[in-house]
Amino acid sequence: MKLILENFRQYLDADEDTLTGLSFEEMSRALGSSMGGAKLALTDSPLQDRTYEQGSTMKPNGLWYAKGNSWMEFVRTELVEMSENAKYVYAIGFDKSKILRIKSGRQAERVTYMFKNHKLSQRANVSIVDWDRITKIGKAGVEFIPYDRGYFSADYTMVWYSGIDVPSGCIWDTSILTTKQIIAELKEDGWEVYR
């Protein structure tokens, strides 16, 4: 433990509110310990207000976020190339009334029933959600927190829900963001974490 603390201290800048020169893994762990309950978005460019076009796909298009560092840890171990392209981590807040919240596999089934693209689903032999129809009821995103990882549909029709990697959400109209604070940024000498 003493060695870990000594190694961690070497990254402290003169400014005690900033950690500098961190690897992606170190940055992720630092945020995990200090921002565990926050909604964090990992991006390759600065956040700007925009609307992502939706269609009938397995997952919606948009700004994905996760609770704490769960997405960053998934990226670090499963999607290494994405971690190499990342440049910013934002803590975000938003108008929750604009988000469709799916807290269980059963709720995902109901959403699928209500917003299924029947033509595409029949051709693909799996349920495909028409995310554009969800935008038409005034929703600007969807959230899977908590995520029912153990849910599995016996007939494999809910593949889209099983493909959610971590407790997360997707915002396709970022104008609902009430907070977008950069909390980590990739610099020349590594990641800088602002506390």
Language-model features, listed with the residues they occupy:
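Extended catalytic/binding region for NAD+/ADP-ribose chemistry, centered on the ART fold
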Residues: 47-85
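Charged/polar, solvent-exposed surface patches and flexible loops
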Residues: 6, 10, 73-77, 113, ...
